[in-house]
C-alpha cells in the first residue's frame, strides 16, 4: 500500500521501520522540525527523519498542517493511507479526507482510556494491571476516532514506564503492520469508542 507516514519520536521510528520491512511503499514522511539537544544545543533530527533518509524517502518538516499550506503537496503525493504515530501536529479535515483509506493513528492505551499524552506513564503511575495499543480511524477530535483494532498488554508491577514502553512499542509496530493489509482487504469493522469508559485519572502518590 502507498503510505504517507507522519511521526516523530522513537516509537514512530520503530513503526516506520516495521512498515518498510513489511514491503509497503512509503511515499513520504512528515515529522517535526530538527531541535537543539544537549548542553551544546546540537541541532538534531527526529528519529523518524533519520530512518526515512536512510531509506531514501522524502521528508517534510512543516511547522503546522492546520493552515492548509501542505494540502496541495499531500494531495500530490497521492497516498492511499496516512499512518500517524506520535506526530505532534493536528491534522485538519482537508488532510484527513485526502487518502482513499483515510488516516489511522496508533495510540498506546486501550482507548478511550488515557486519551491524550503520556498514556503509558499514566498507566504505570496509577498501578494499572494492563494497558495496550489501539489503532483508530482518525477524525477531527483528539483520540476520538473509531477503533479498528486493539491489543491488551499485561503490566509487570516491577517494571518501569520505560521498560513497559519498549514492550508497547514492539507490540504497536506489529499490530500496525497487521492492520494495514486488513484495511485494504476491508476486513475490519470500526467500533465507536465507549464513552462511558472515559475518565481522567490522577497519578497515585508513591512513597
Regions found by a protein language model. Name each.
Residues 2-4, 27-29, 58-77, 82, ...:
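Internal alpha/beta domain cores that form substrate/cofactor-binding pockets in large enzymes
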Residues 19, 52-57, 128:
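A generic structural signal for well-ordered alpha-helical segments
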Residues 13, 17-21, 72-75, 93, ...:
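Amphipathic, non-transmembrane alpha-helical secondary structure
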Residues 22, 81-196:
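Donor/substrate-binding cores of folate-linked one-carbon enzymes
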Residues 13, 42-45, 67-71, 89, ...:
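Structural motif corresponding to alpha-helix initiation and N-cap regions
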Residues 35-53:
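N-terminal beta-loop-helix "entrance" segment that forms/cooperates
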